[in-house]
Amino acid sequence: MAPTLQDLTPSAGMKKTLQDEIEAILQERIMVLDGGMGTMIQRHKLSEEDFRGQEFKDHARPLKGNNDILSITQPNVIYQIHKEYLLAGADIIETNTFSSTSIAQADYGLEHLAYRMNMCSAGVARKAAEDISLQTGIKRYVAGALGPTNKTLSVSPSVERPDYRNITFDELVEAYKEQAKGLLDGGVDILLIETIFDTANAKAALFAVQKLFEEEYVPRPVFISGTIVDKSGRTLSGQTGEAFVISVSHADPLCIGLNCALGAAEMRPFIETIGKCTTAYVLCYPNAGLPNTFGDYDETPHVMAMHLKDFAVDGLVNIVGGCCGTTPDHIREIAEAVKNCKPRVPPATVFEGHMLLSGLEPFRIGPYTNFVNIGERCNVAGSRRFAKLIMAGNYEEALSVAKMQVEMGAQVLDINMDDGMLDGPSAMTRFCNFIASEPDIAKVPLCIDSSNFAVIEAGLKCCQGKCIVNSISLKEGEDDFLEKARKIKKFGAAVVVMAFDEEGQATETDPKIRVCTRAYHLLLKKLGFNPNDIIFDPNILTIGTGMEEHNLYAVNFINATKVIKETLPGAKVSGGLSNLSFSFRGMEAIREAMHGVFLYHAIKFGMDMGIVNAGSLPVYDDIHKELLQLCEDLIWNRDPEATEKLLHYAQTQGKGGKKVIQTDEWRNGPLEERLEYALVKGIEKYIIEDTEEARLNQEKYPRPLNIIEGPLMNGMKIVGDLFGAGKMFLPQVIKSARVMKKAVGHLIPFMEKEREETKVLTGKIEDEDPYQGTIVLATVKGDVHDIGKNIVGVVLGCNNFRVIDLGVMTPCDKILKAALDHKADIIGLSGLITPSLDEMIFVAKEMERLAIKIPLLIGGATTSRTHTAVKIAPRYSAPVIHVLDASKSVVVCSQLLDENLKDEYFEEILEEYEDIRQDHYESLKERRYLTLRQARENGFHIDWLSEPPPVKPTFLGTRVFEDYDLQKLVDYIDWKPFFDVWQLRGKYPNRGFPKIFDDKTVGEEAKKVYDDAQNMLQALISQKKLQARGVVGFWPAQSIQDDIHLYAEGAVPQASEPIATFYGLRQQAEKDSASSDPYLCLSDFIAPLHSGIPDYLGLFAVACFGVEELSKAYEEECDDYSSIMVKALGDRLAEAFAEELHERARRELWGYCSGEQLAVADLRRLRYEGIRPAPGYPSQPDHTEKLTVWRLADVEQRTGIRLTESLAMAPASAVSGLYFSNLKSKYFAVGKISKDQIEDYASRKNMSVAEVEKWLGPILGYDTD
């Protein structure tokens, strides 16, 4: 049983003594925290049995990797780790409790042990600290670590349901409360809430801790440490560092800082930010640098110590330590490095006199802040549109109201769900959760507005930022008022206090002042409320009602505001503006004018903020003079007839509007400007007309070539410059190229005529080349994918390069012949599938053999800088350069062809690639692999006898789907890869579809391309320009070790020969010692032959036909944009076909999930049961396995989908794979494998080792050269 407050308080103020003790040290020197616990546990290489110990030897779930259980099962190991850190110089050690909440432990089935786990961990750390304190004579401290849990309050686990949460605030509070009790009972000195990726979770932890300190325990010092996940300077849930500090400072932490995710060098700017916005001490315990490609940490103790010493010398820190990858050696060096450095001196105040609020971003309201607009339209009582949407349950559309308010200038967003037909707490929770999913809205603080305190609490539990509560009052007396205010303070919110007490609503000036003054002193004296967090609403009441007693309501508010601001330091004044003009509802022009006039004066008297319709407030000086005077008279009560006069004004004034007239004003400019404008804007309409006008101007352009070299190239140069500067995007560039091609196409007949005439006159042909250089592009032999290559060609063409595009499946000899025939300056090779890599190596070898010494560019989805540097560049003595995408191609080609730059550029590439090769070969030496036998022993072993029996498909054999309805596939299209084709990538928080449309940089262009795609898609479907065909098949199947055998229908597998075999590859790269993950192979998901349990395997192949023909037709019309668009859509339709057919397989064709009801977004997040891995991809990287699919289902004969010699599918818009139904099956990557598996695999497949190595080159864990 937990001790009571009385038990733990033998004398005055333990917290004061302990906090003062630590604070005294912090004022004298920099303290040192310990390093990574997980890192040290891994060094012990503990087995599953070690993790289980005797107590848990029969536990149903694996426990290896559950480091926290070791405090119970292996306390000596944890004690020794603590001791090592203490002897290395740590002043403070953290308990081994990062995942010791019931929430995190539920993954291991140990949630019932959370309290015990924490108490034991605290006890182990306490003993280590006391032993070393006694040994060294230096007191050491124990910090009880409260980790973030594996669930989040601010982010939905479901893309389709942004309002859904799989944990509640109250559940988190209870879990943290249980954890903190165990830590406190175990004897910790400090509570450290750490690795905060979601501030809402941290606020739940702080709420729990504060509750314990209030009710049961003597308070301890609290440390808070957030985690900035990348260089954007934000937490995983999107908050900036300053917003994070504002959100948690209500808990009065002794220390606040950052840990994890970043190395010290990367963390520095964010630690500086933390220090500038807190009066607390600053702690900093980064990782040992950034993780390498294997997820390990390489930063040496010395390097890390020097970084942290720089922090200390510059006065940034009070406590330093280490997180992931750090060891006692790191802590020893860090302690030595900072021991003579002076600690940071915390400022006495920060942002003095400011109200500090936060959403994802900070918002400071100070003496010089302009009037703060609190957006009013997200109020079911104040906005008919919003109310209608909420009542209909259309919360996503209601978000648009919130977004519009922010866009129109609302700095805070008021949310009100008070309606008798609504479940207020539920509606508030749901809408606030929706807001959290939209960073453009969530960036501003929220004002949780309700007359029902249960609704207010519901809203507060959803907000990771520091928000405003609107409102509380003295209406129900002081006890009720203080109870609510105490809760609000515990949530860390500011509060609006209404001028309302036991006697009712204050309408006169003096009662307003009296009620507000009373409330102010209660909050400060009884609760220690920060005066800067108090907002008074002295009641803006309706004027112009026709009742004389209402005429002074505006004047009374303004006068009360002046006194409140003069006599209640720090307090702010707000009010609901729409109340003022309620008598004039329906007369929006009058109401807006009244609001503008009222605010003009109220702000002068000290009103700080107001709930307004952001964006609809007129400027005082812009109000019509007659209307202005009438409003002034009404507000100041200067004319008893003011109301009647305003009504008369409204009735006599008509409404006017303006028409927006669009003109083609650019058409009035000079010819050259018109040509350039058309090219830059991608306007085709007049290009032939203008080009012909230029051609007819023989005086200025005597030859057609002069037009190309002059205004057309000038326009394309502007396009290239804008694209290079990131001010123009790929779809726009391609539209510009389309215009250019039409112009050039118009001129070509005239140029050919001129050439013939020259030949007749002189007997020879002029050698003209206006281009910057000639580049031959080709997709290599056996590969049919060319969207990326085509885009590169268009971009290069726009930058004055002559591009010779040889298309797809181009043999080496054809590539080299074209390069010689066209006197190419550069060759560019493209490929998507892994066999293309070998073909690229072959081309490089041939170029070397034939002494064709021109630069070779390598690109395509399967290529990489490492493969280019290691496998291709050594075969060729001229430049070989990997090009990431079209935007990089121009820069690379320009440098390679610039006489002044090319040699230096080539030298840089040689040095860079040599470094890459060295790193690669070093990494091969360091990698460790299990033997194939060990990997199989540690495979994924399903207890088939206890599993539900596999479902038999509704048919065995194959079924063909002819001319599949494309309209059915549209909803299954995943649009993200579509935007990747066009190199349109939104930045956080606007990544993915449809958020990309909100991106400030690419959003507008993305929407245009998407609209073009929708138009083309509907035309393709309605005009039946494309056809979809596919085949699905199912067979009895059993696994034998790593292979899957298929059998004829009706055969008894144990007594029959298989009709086909799919050969599997198993993971071999050694996993982290703390990991209990199995070494997977696809065969693990099929019942073994010896089990006697019948199982089944499915396969499919689908394609979209007609794409190539349409694309070619567009190219012949000089329309690259439409050519690329139809290919991109063809690929999307093929993938959608695969997705839709897999759904049908699960629900009806196989029927193992007949009741499945998943949203499309859940399909993309792989939330369905079973998998559909494809040969040639991570779970089975061998493309030769496609041959078995094709033979078994007679794919080419039945569908027309064929395989090239490199086993690419043709047409390119095609997808194929296998169907697995086991509920435990999952996607995985085989990763690198060692030679013993290659030899075994070659033997099973009856192939030579060399042939297998050729097909599996990218996953070989050894070098074959």
UniProtKB/Swiss-Prot annotation:
Its EC number is 2.1.1.13. Catalyzes the transfer of a methyl group from methylcob(III)alamin (MeCbl) to homocysteine, yielding enzyme-bound cob(I)alamin and methionine in the cytosol. MeCbl is an active form of cobalamin (vitamin B12) used as a cofactor for methionine biosynthesis. Cob(I)alamin form is regenerated to MeCbl by a transfer of a methyl group from 5-methyltetrahydrofolate. It catalyses: (6S)-5-methyl-5,6,7,8-tetrahydrofolate + L-homocysteine = (6S)-5,6,7,8-tetrahydrofolate + L-methionine. Its cofactor is methylcob(III)alamin; Zn(2+). Pathway: Amino-acid biosynthesis; L-methionine biosynthesis via de novo pathway; L-methionine from L-homocysteine (MetH route): step 1/1. S-adenosyl-L-methionine binds at D974, R1172, Y1227, F1228. Residues 662-759 form the B12-binding N-terminal domain. This is Methionine synthase. Monomer. Dimer. Forms a multiprotein complex with MMACHC, MMADHC and MTRR. The keyword DNA damage does not apply. One of its GO terms (biological process) is homocysteine metabolic process. Residues 371-632 form the Pterin-binding domain. One of its GO terms (molecular function) is cobalamin binding. The gene is MTR. Methylcob(III)alamin binds at E709, G782, D783, V784, H785, D786, S830, T834, A886. NCBIfam families: metH, PRK09490.1. Residues 923-1265 form the AdoMet activation domain. SMART domains: B12-binding_2 (SM01018). The modification Phosphothreonine is found at T1264. Zn(2+) binds at C260, C323, C324. It is found in: Cytoplasm. The keyword Transferase applies. Keywords: Amino-acid biosynthesis, Cobalamin, Cobalt, Cytoplasm, Metal-binding, Methionine biosynthesis, Methyltransferase, Phosphoprotein, Repeat, S-adenosyl-L-methionine, Transferase, Zinc. Pfam families: B12-binding, B12-binding_2, Met_synt_B12, Pterin_bind, S-methyl_trans.
